[in-house]
């Protein structure tokens, strides 16, 4: 038996989950927020209890020390050496990492170099990796990349229709994201359907604050909606998703607050999507409350959101030449029945039909009717478990 920590580190946060392996039992989980800011918050959940502390945590190394000391303080572990592996979620692996890898100095350097592909994510992940290596130098650290699952895409799918020198010289191409989530829910869908994954054509819809949709052909990613960065695809919580790129120089010319391309991209990443259109929130619960109040901006934001998701799912029916099932996962995908109802309502031509008694908050499983030609599934994603499994698989290979 061993204990493995799955880590998702951001620029100012560190989310974690501790597993007993190979039993895959969750021993504890938590998050450290506001790293580098005043009044940092450390939350630990274990044995049905929740402990919260307000601290000043200056960097990721200090955050990791607090996390490990809390595990001992609350009796979850007796000593650091009970932890036998650490797994880190890394958003961008580019073309360098086609699968999960054991961390060494070169790998860490490459992750930092790939920050250009995920400037909001990779630097935080690198800081988390460095902190754990400093504090637990003898324990195996493994990186699990969001992009790895999508390296199976064909060249004609991942290349953009621009001069090829931009790919050969600068590696401009579609990379995708959320790969760990898409891989996990596809595996779970195969179990639920009682069929080998290698025989299935699935469309997996990861709909949270970030939104990505993937065409899964026989267990491999055939296409996915996120692109060179996670900004591409359908409308999201704070991200615009796909727009005409000519809008960027136009806005720089017209709006004095947008001084350069970086300003526009920041607006598209952080101030757009549901939040930007509605002026209310990036949270679907707040948008749905706005629908109840007939708030016109909430209605508009919701309608754009549904429209973009339907279009994306529809194109993947074409990519796969049909599908056996559509899988909803992540925060909104799992917990927004109205959104699922309205998305499926625009896809009935493909032979999908959902049971309103099953399409309710909290239900997991097959929500389609017996007559539905394409099954509609709601599956809880578990990226942390995928990370822990890869640590278990790789920890003796370094």
UniProtKB/Swiss-Prot annotation:
<feature type="site" description="Transition state stabilizer">
    <location>
        <position position="178"/>
    </location>
</feature>
<feature type="binding site">
    <location>
        <position position="383"/>
    </location>
    <ligand>
        <name>Mg(2+)</name>
    </ligand>
</feature>
<dbReference type="Pfam" id="PF00871">
    <property type="entry name" value="Acetate_kinase"/>
</dbReference>
<dbReference type="GO" id="GO:0005737">
    <property type="term" value="C:cytoplasm"/>
</dbReference>
<dbReference type="GO" id="GO:0008776">
    <property type="term" value="F:acetate kinase activity"/>
</dbReference>
<keyword id="KW-0479">Metal-binding</keyword>
<feature type="binding site">
    <location>
        <begin position="331"/>
        <end position="335"/>
    </location>
    <ligand>
        <name>ATP</name>
    </ligand>
</feature>
<keyword id="KW-0418">Kinase</keyword>
<feature type="binding site">
    <location>
        <position position="89"/>
    </location>
    <ligand>
        <name>substrate</name>
    </ligand>
</feature>
<feature type="site" description="Transition state stabilizer">
    <location>
        <position position="239"/>
    </location>
</feature>
<dbReference type="InterPro" id="IPR023865">
    <property type="entry name" value="Aliphatic_acid_kinase_CS"/>
</dbReference>
<feature type="active site" description="Proton donor/acceptor">
    <location>
        <position position="146"/>
    </location>
</feature>
<keyword id="KW-0547">Nucleotide-binding</keyword>
<comment type="similarity">
    <text>Belongs to the acetokinase family.</text>
</comment>
<keyword id="KW-0067">ATP-binding</keyword>
<dbReference type="InterPro" id="IPR043129">
    <property type="entry name" value="ATPase_NBD"/>
</dbReference>
<dbReference type="GO" id="GO:0005524">
    <property type="term" value="F:ATP binding"/>
</dbReference>
<keyword id="KW-0808">Transferase</keyword>
<protein>
    <recommendedName>
        <fullName>Acetate kinase</fullName>
        <ecNumber>2.7.2.1</ecNumber>
    </recommendedName>
</protein>
<keyword id="KW-0963">Cytoplasm</keyword>
<feature type="binding site">
    <location>
        <begin position="283"/>
        <end position="285"/>
    </location>
    <ligand>
        <name>ATP</name>
    </ligand>
</feature>
<feature type="binding site">
    <location>
        <begin position="206"/>
        <end position="210"/>
    </location>
    <ligand>
        <name>ATP</name>
    </ligand>
</feature>
<keyword id="KW-0460">Magnesium</keyword>
<comment type="pathway">
    <text>Metabolic intermediate biosynthesis; acetyl-CoA biosynthesis; acetyl-CoA from acetate: step 1/2.</text>
</comment>
<dbReference type="GO" id="GO:0006085">
    <property type="term" value="P:acetyl-CoA biosynthetic process"/>
</dbReference>
<comment type="subunit">
    <text>Homodimer.</text>
</comment>
<dbReference type="InterPro" id="IPR000890">
    <property type="entry name" value="Aliphatic_acid_kin_short-chain"/>
</dbReference>
<dbReference type="InterPro" id="IPR004372">
    <property type="entry name" value="Ac/propionate_kinase"/>
</dbReference>
<feature type="binding site">
    <location>
        <position position="8"/>
    </location>
    <ligand>
        <name>Mg(2+)</name>
    </ligand>
</feature>
<dbReference type="GO" id="GO:0006083">
    <property type="term" value="P:acetate metabolic process"/>
</dbReference>
<feature type="binding site">
    <location>
        <position position="15"/>
    </location>
    <ligand>
        <name>ATP</name>
    </ligand>
</feature>
<comment type="function">
    <text>Catalyzes the formation of acetyl phosphate from acetate and ATP. Can also catalyze the reverse reaction.</text>
</comment>
<dbReference type="GO" id="GO:0000287">
    <property type="term" value="F:magnesium ion binding"/>
</dbReference>
